[in-house]
């Protein structure tokens, strides 16, 4: 029986200078092409500028062997026959704040996250942002307290215990509550120390990682999609693209598309950590060799089965606000949108279910176009500032929820400043990367799933009218007087210049309980006639009678003067008119619609 190798991706994330690259190097036995600060700029500055990859292998633990489905392990050329191995691929993500785009790209291919903390400094800004990304994109966490060699020997254990308690408290309100925390010294003495200095705690860390790892569910079906992080040429062979398979599978001789360039190439050969293979599937990290392709055209990006990705100009996404982000998410605001392997600016419009559907079960993998949605001036959340939530009138005008009642699911229309190529149902992260990187604030604003991409450049005309997002409009006026038992005159609902003909046929409610229908304009001053199909109640007539009596007593010769006087006469108490209607945001005819 050939040896088998199961691949699991472990992300190494944390603040700049926390020792992530040194830790990955200490853990690794095999370095992949993109590993360990290969970029000259990165080596000079001592920070990781791109995703570095390396790996180590251990015998597959017995607890994982028994549950291993046959299709989840890929045959390899070199392991000892019959000895299945667990290959841990380490994804070393940069910790520099301005490179958060790269971190987000890396987190999407990670099965378990190692959060590296400098034990002398504790939780820092980028550590917190990495933790936020981990909560979105990852299920398991191991916290590594690095640089314990810098702690005074006599106080070392006390300092480690103190930081462990701090981290446990930090994780308490996250999905990673109770995650294991382990102290190490990846490179005792720091970067300048001689290589002879042995790392501390690495065997224990490997043991901990092995105990925490579970074999991810891998699915070879579906279209092939690979996240490419490095591209280079080999003389006489061709161009090699290295990366991790996000979905599907691939075999020798298959055709792949580089969607950003609209180029299709045939797979000539494949390698996984320097070992030739004939096929690979979701979760595997490999290099694909193609011919006649300039590696300079693609440093990072996506490679896929031909025509399986779409390029979109806008998208409908589900939205969930990141609680650590300060401030509201407002309609018309611009955010950095990370989708697929790209980060572009996008303008957002938020919307929610209609108020009656606020408690409906969230649908995570599709968008229902037959349903009506309520426009929102901003994402609804319980942490809105009092200045916003106290303004009930503004809330009503926008049709927003008051008293902290929030819908279980919300969405946004994102309009990208330039088209993006991405898979369907992919992760979307919105952030404010232009915020000051030195302030101690979370720049990650929201996350969600891309539910529907709009590929037509003219989507505003061809698609958006299908999207039934409405604003709820409320107008209030007064009944000036009754004309007879079945009609009244209203005022103060419209401006003088309003074309009242547009509102004819709309229903209004009187504060006395009657239902009326706008019948016609009355004069030129914005007044209008309302028909009351059920007639005025005796109580309403009593309120509105002063004007009727005055008109009845008026003599013929004084008709005009008395009519003017009657118009000025007020009822004994105000009767308020309420007009409520929907206006659909993308209706080109701007029609007003009322519920039956």
Swiss-Prot record:
It is found in: Cytoplasm; Nucleus. Its cofactor is Mg(2+); Mn(2+). Keywords: Cytoplasm, Disease variant, GTP-binding, Hydrolase, Intellectual disability, Methylation, Neurodegeneration, Nucleotide-binding, Nucleus, Phosphoprotein, Protein biosynthesis. Its EC number is 3.6.5.-. It catalyses: GTP + H2O = GDP + phosphate + H(+). Residues 5-217 form the tr-type G domain. The modification Phosphoserine is found at residue 537. GDP binds at residues 19, 21-22, 149, 187. The keyword GTP-binding applies. Residues 14-21 are annotated as: G1. This is Selenocysteine-specific elongation factor. The gene is EEFSEC.
């Amino acid at each position: 029986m050939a040896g088998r190798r199961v691949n699991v991706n472990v992300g190494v994330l944390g603040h700049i200078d926390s020792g992530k690259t040194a830790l990955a190097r200490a853990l690794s036995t095999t370095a992949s092409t993109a590993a360990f600060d290969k970029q000259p700029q990165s080596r000079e500055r001592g920070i990781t500028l791109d995703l570095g990859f390396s790996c180590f292998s251990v015998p597959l633990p017995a607890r994982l062997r028994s549950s291993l489905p046959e299709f989840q392990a890929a045959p390899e050329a070199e392991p000892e026959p019959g000895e299945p191995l667990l290959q841990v691929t380490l994804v070393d993500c940069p910790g520099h704040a301005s490179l958060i785009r790269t971190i987000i790209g890396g987190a999407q291919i990670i099965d378990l996250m190692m959060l590296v903390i400098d034990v002398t400094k504790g939780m820092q800004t980028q550590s917190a942002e990495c933790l936020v990304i981990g909560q979105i994109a990852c299920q398991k966490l191991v916290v590594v307290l690095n640089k314990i060699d810098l702690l005074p020997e006599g106080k070392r254990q006390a300092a480690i215990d103190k930081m462990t308690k701090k981290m446990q408290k930090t994780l308490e309100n996250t999905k990673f509550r109770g995650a294991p925390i382990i102290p190490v010294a990846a490179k005792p003495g720091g970067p300048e120390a001689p290589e002879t200095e042995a790392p501390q705690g690495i065997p224990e860390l490997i043991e901990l990682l092995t105990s925490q790892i579970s074999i991810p569910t891998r699915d070879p079906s579906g279209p092939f999609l690979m996240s490419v992080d490095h591209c280079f040429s080999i003389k006489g062979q061709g161009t090699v693209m290295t990366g991790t398979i996000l979905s599907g599978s691939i075999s020798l001789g298959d055709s792949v598309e580089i969607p950003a360039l609209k180029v299709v190439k045939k797979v000539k050969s494949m390698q996984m950590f320097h070992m030739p293979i004939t096929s690979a599937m979701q979760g595997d990290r490999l290099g694909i060799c193609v011919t006649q392709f300039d590696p300079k055209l693609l440093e990072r990006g996506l490679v896929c089965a031909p025509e399986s990705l779409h390029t979109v100009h806008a998208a409908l996404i589900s939205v969930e606000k990141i609680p650590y982000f300060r401030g509201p998410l407002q309609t018309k605001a611009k955010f950095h949108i990370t989708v697929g392997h790209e980060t572009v600016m996008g303008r957002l419009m938020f919307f929610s279910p209609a108020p009656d559907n606020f408690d409906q079960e969230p649908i995570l993998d599709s968008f229902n176009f037959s349903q009506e949605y309520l426009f929102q001036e901003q994402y609804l959340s319980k942490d809105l500032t009092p200045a916003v939530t106290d303004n009930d009138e503004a809330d009503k005008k926008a049709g927003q929820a008051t008293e902290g009642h929030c819908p279980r699911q919300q969405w946004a229309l994102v309009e990208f400043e330039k088209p993006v190529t991405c898979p369907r149902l992919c992760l979307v992260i919105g952030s404010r990367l232009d915020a000051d990187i030195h302030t101690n604030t979370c720049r990650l604003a929201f996350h969600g799933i891309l539910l529907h991409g709009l590929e037509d450049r003219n989507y505003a005309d061809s698609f958006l009218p299908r999207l039934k997002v409405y604003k709820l409009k409320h107008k209030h006026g007064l009944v000036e007087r009754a004309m007879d038992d079945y009609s009244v005159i209203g005022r103060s609902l419209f401006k003088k210049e309003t074309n009242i003909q547009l509102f004819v046929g709309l229903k209004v409610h009187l504060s006395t309980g009657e239902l009326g229908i706008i019948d016609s304009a009355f004069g030129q001053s914005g007044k209008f006639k309302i028909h009351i199909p059920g007639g005025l109640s005796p109580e309403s007539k009593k309120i509105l009678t002063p004007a009727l009596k005055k008109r009845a007593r008026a003599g013929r010769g004084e008709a005009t003067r008395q009519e003017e006087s009657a118009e000025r006469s007020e009822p004994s108490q105000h009767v308020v008119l309420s007009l409520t209607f929907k206006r659909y945001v993308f209706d080109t005819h701007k029609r007003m619609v009322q519920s039956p």
